[in-house]
Each structure stands twice: as structure tokens, then as C-alpha cells.
């Protein structure tokens, strides 16, 4: 006979692998491997990333703590991964044992409740593009309360600028898609951006890191990352890879859905939406003259940008390329809007 249920009760989140503690919401969220393909990825836990999760979280938190702008101008709250456990096949190992790597693992992440103050809520960013059973958008009560344009301006600034500042000022790309990102609101008004899930969704370029930010220190496992070629783990070959990560996850496969909802529900033209985003990013650059050379290396406003082909990657696992070029709606004179393909 089985042992039966033991300990706290957990409930899976929309991302499936992350479990919330329902018995005590102040306790950690646990991320577990899952043997499915969802979007473009197999949802196990990459073996190398599990023991590295606390290192990456500590590295990111140190960057946030050292820059007061993440507290004032670009409010950013992280949900750090502070502990992990994984099966390692060791050497020598059988094929069966190797197959268990990434399938028997767990990562402990700080809970959302500990990052909120009284009166605040944390809303998954992809909820902003959802429709309710009454035929109105999820965001409609907030739009009615605050007005569409004021609410949108505040939301775009709150969601975009922390990620953009981390990229432009600190040389770190974050995978800020709709499940990893949460909008902290008070009565529907944006307060801060909350980010999670860093163990396999952070990228940097050695030459693009400022001189005061060292590469993450993986301790006794440093050799694994030092010997690995660029683009295999966290270290990328150039700023273009960081731009693609951020613009893919934040704009093309995230905010584009909000733009569509605003157009369908309120007649807010999609091209106007992206012009507003362009002005926000241009204003950031104007306010940060020292960062202009770094922003130029990103090429965020060039007419064509490269983006990941999620469907091709899922259906054609042996495809020679899983990316393609699309018109950039953030160029000064964009002919059309960004569209996920």
C-alpha cells in the first residue's frame, strides 16, 4: 500500500511545472519537471540549470540591489530561486540513469506573497490579454476606473522599462514572457514588475556586461560554463542574441496580444500602440545619454529583426533554422505591427 498524501497541499500554476503551496501561501513555490512538450520546449528541467538556479538568482538580485533605479524609476521585484535538488547519473553511468537527469529534480522559489504589501495584487502578464465570459476584457474594470490612455501609459512603462534597463544598462537579457512576468497592481493601477524563473531564461554577453558587473560565479561547477561555447548556456556571442530574447518574449509573444485586445475591444489602433512603445524606448534613451552607444549595439529600432519561429521549432525538430525575420513595429516608420508567427 502507498504512504498516502504527506505534507502541505500544492496546486499547479498556469505554467504547469510550478506548484503553489495552498496550505501555507507564505511557503516556497516548487518547480518540478514535466514530461511534455509545450510551446517550443520539452518541459523537463535542464540538468545543468538546476544546481545553477540559486547562483543565477543571487547574481541577478545583486544587480538589482546595487542599482537604486530598480526601486524608484523602474520598480522591479524578483522571485529568487534559492534552493534546488537534482539526480545526477555520475560516471560511469548507464543510458537509463542518464535519462533520469532533468526528470528527477526540484527548484524552490520565493513565494509571491512575500513580495507584496497590503492592498497589492500580482497578475500574470498574459492575463491582460484575456477575455471574460461576459465578452469584456479582463482589464476592463481597470480601464473604466483609470481611463484607457493613462492606464496603458503606466502599464507599458511599468512592464517594459525594468526589463529594458536590465538589458541596456546591465547587459543582461531576461525572458519576460507572459508567464514569467507578473504585473503588481493596486486597484488595477501598475506598481511594479515582478519576474521569476531565471535558471534557464537569463542571458548575457561577456563584452556587453559593464565593468562593475562580474559574470556569475558557479564555484566548483565553473569549468562547465567556462569550457562551453557561446550560445550553449547563459553566455551569448553578441548583443543581438539579448535583443532577440527580450523583444521576442516581451513584445512579439507578449505585449502584441495586449495590443490586439485593445484594438478589438476599444478600437485602439495597433499601430498607435507600437508608436507608444517606440516613444517610451526613445525617451529612455534620451534620458540615458551615457547608454546610447550600448543601445545602438542592440539595434532595437532597425526595420527588420530576427525572431524565433515557435511553431517550426515544435513541429520540425530537425529544422536547420528556427528563426526568421519580421518587420519591426518599433522602427521609426514601421509599415505594420509585430505579429507572432
What residues fall within each predicted segment?
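An amphipathic, hydrophobic-aromatic interaction surface with interspersed Lys/Arg
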Residues: 156-172
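Short amphipathic alpha-helical surface micro-motifs
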Residues: 11-15, 164-165, 174-178
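Nucleotide/phosphate-binding site architecture used for ATP/NTP-dependent chemistry
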Residues: 1-158, 185-341
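A short glycine-rich, hydrophobically flanked beta-strand micro-motif that places a catalytic Asp/Glu
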Residues: 170-184
